[in-house]
Amino acid sequence: MRKIILASGSPRRKELLELAGVPFEIIVSEVEETIGAYSSPSDIVMSLALQKASAVAENNSDHIVLGADTIVTYESRILGKPSNEAEAKEMLQLLSGKTHEVYTGVAIIAKDKTVTFYERTEVTFWELTEEEIDAYIASKEPLDKAGSYGIQGKGSIFVQHIQGDYYSVVGLPISRLVRELKQFNIDVTHA
């Protein structure tokens, strides 16, 4: 039987696959992510997810490889992972009291088929005080997350409203993924 391989070292993606009962192994993609001239955030996340999955699939062609990528956007500006605490603070100040978009792209590669898709979720933050932002940054939680927050952690207290898939904001639209895996004859709903 073909194995499912997650081409990511993200603990959040690992947890979501485990939560859904998807059997998998992890092989972290070492690909250098490159963003070309793309017209939309959805194109970017699907391309990056495909780059990650393709790099792992090269040496695992008999298996199904999953790649994923998440970005946060606000007014056409892409907010990736902050490079330092000052950048994290700038991002959180930018998002304070506003609605932003989170895009997660997924690529599923097998020998006979490749599927890519994305989910877009709108997230609205409460107005944040400087003290709230500074305390959150001091926790170190935002430093490895796109947009400088983790909706599944302490960053959850900043969220006023969400429209779309919560799990996509965490890093993997698990409900959609499980449905897409059926195209590869993988059905975890009966496991």
UniProtKB/Swiss-Prot annotation:
Reactions this protein catalyses: dTTP + H2O = dTMP + diphosphate + H(+); UTP + H2O = UMP + diphosphate + H(+)
Family: Belongs to the Maf family. YhdE subfamily.
Cofactor: a divalent metal cation
Organism: Bacillus cereus (strain ZK / E33L)
GO molecular function, one term: UTP diphosphatase activity
Role according to the record: Nucleoside triphosphate pyrophosphatase that hydrolyzes dTTP and UTP. May have a dual role in cell division arrest and in preventing the incorporation of modified nucleotides into cellular nucleic acids.
Subcellular location: Cytoplasm
UniProt cross-references to SUPFAM superfamilies, sorted A to Z: ITPase-like
Alphabetized CDD domains for the sequence: Maf (cd00555)
Active-site residues, Swiss-Prot/TrEMBL: D69
Protein name: dTTP/UTP pyrophosphatase
UniProt xrefs under HAMAP family: Maf
Gene3D superfamilies recorded: 3.90.950.10
Annotated site residue numbers, Important for substrate specificity: R12, T70, Q152
UniProt EC number: 3.6.1.9
Keywords carried by this UniProt record: Cytoplasm, Hydrolase, Nucleotide metabolism
Pfam families noted in UniProt: Maf (PF02545)
Domain of life according to the entry: Bacteria
Gene Ontology cellular-component annotations: cytoplasm
Gene Ontology biological-process entries: nucleotide metabolic process
